[in-house]
A protein has these predicted regions:
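Residue(s) in the substrate-gating loop at a strand-loop-helix junction
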Residues: 202
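Conserved amphipathic alpha-helix within the SDR
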Residues: 111, 118-121, 127-142
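Substrate-binding pocket helix/loop in short-chain dehydrogenase/reductase
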Residues: 158-159, 163-168
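Conserved glycine-rich Rossmann-like NAD(P)H-binding loop of the short-chain dehydrogenase/reductase
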Residues: 89-105
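SDR active-site lid
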Residues: 232-293
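Active-site helix of classical SDR
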Residues: 182, 218
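Canonical Rossmann dinucleotide-binding motif of NAD(H)/NADP(H)-dependent dehydrogenases/reductases
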Residues: 54-94
Length: 334
């Protein structure tokens, strides 16, 4: 029986002595399953009612004042805007980027506004670099309260025209780096049963797109990783550690060239950062930007696959085929 149902039994004002009553085992098992199904139906109703209620009375945002917040890829784009906005909310920022000049520029802006920032040059594609810099963060700043895995890279083009080293680098930065940073900073969160992991993924990690095969695959991976991690934390009874996955559409960070789309607009990094922070501080599990895309994603699952493909063509979601694999570096992020 589910834990909530057990607690209901334990705290109920009605007590029956059934110690002398025994059902045959097959019937008892079926009764148990039936009761669990009843509980699930009531819990489903409760969840819907709560969602409707929250449309009228939104969840209050939690405070990050004095919290230590680490942002990877903080020198540019979404990472920079996330760092600036978190600082304005009172957070202590730990900035990682491979580009020292860009990282220092972000820190300077934070300090000019009266905030606190620590900067570290780190190539998140290299495990040894992550381990070295993580140790330094523990010594200089302390335990990280909020880990923002944002650094990303994109090499667009036809799959067979993308260089092998570019595919490997895409996964090293967009996917594997998330595992390595988690292995460094999650243990201290587990000890305290407190923390927040924010994963910057992409809508390309919810719906595959032509000429973004490697990129889409890397973002699908981190979406699944964060979802699985959330389930693992729940099973470990570490519900004080929250996870949020951010899935923006095309963002003007300099990564995506020749984007196409008949509807909507290219998002600015600041728009994405504001939506991401608002969702994370309300402990939302998934934040899609713009919010209107959530309806399309939910409804899209109800349609046949061929129709969904035709719908993508109608909307024009993706990048143009003339976008060839280009030289990119991970100081540009999604």
């Amino acid at each position: 029986v589910y834990p909530e149902f057990k607690r209901l039994q334990a705290t109920s004002c009605l007590h029956f002595d059934l110690s002398h009553f025994r059902l045959p085992l097959p019937i008892a098992v079926e009764m148990n399953i039936f009761l669990e199904l009843i509980y699930l139906l009531f819990f489903l109703l409760y969840c819907y009612l709560e969602s409707i209620f929250r449309l009228v009375v939104p969840v209050k945002r939690k405070s990050v004042k004095g919290k230590i917040i680490l942002v990877t890829g903080a020198g540019h784009g979404i990472g920079k805007e996330l760092a600036l906005e978190f600082s304005r909310l009172g957070g202590i920022l730990v900035l990682w980027d491979i580009n020292k000049a860009n990282n220092d520029a972000t820190a300077d802006e934070i300090r000019e506004e009266g905030g606190t920032a620590y900067t570290y040059v780190c190539d998140v594609s290299k495990l040894d670099d992550i381990k070295r810099v993580s140790d330094q963060v523990y010594r200089d700043v302390g335990n990280v309260d909020i880990l923002v895995n944002n650094a990303g890279i994109l090499h667009g083009g036809e799959l067979l025209k993308i260089k092998e080293e570019d595919i490997r680098r895409t996964f090293d930065i967009n996917t594997m780096a998330h595992f390595w940073t988690l292995r460094e900073f999650l243990p201290s969160m587990l000890e305290r049963n407190e923390g927040h992991i924010i994963t910057v993924a992409s809508m390309a990690g919810k719906a595959g797109s032509a000429y973004l095969v490697d990129y889409s695959a890397s973002k699908f991976a981190v979406f699944g990783m964060t979802e699985a991690l959330s389930e693992e934390l729940h099973h470990l009874h570490k519900d004080g550690i929250k996870t949020t996955t951010v899935c923006p559409m095309f963002v003007d960070t300099g990564l995506t060239k020749y984007p196409q789309g008949r509807f909507g607009k290219i998002l600015s990094p600041k728009e994405v950062a504001l939506e991401a922070i608002d969702g994370a501080l309300k402990d939302h599990v998934v934040v899609m930007v713009p919010r209107s895309i959530q309806v399309s994603v939910v409804l899209g699952q109800l349609f046949p696959y061929r129709f969904r493909r035709r719908l993508k063509e109608f909307v024009g979601f993706g990048i143009l085929p003339q976008y060839e694999s280009s030289k990119s570096s991970d100081n540009k992020h999604t």
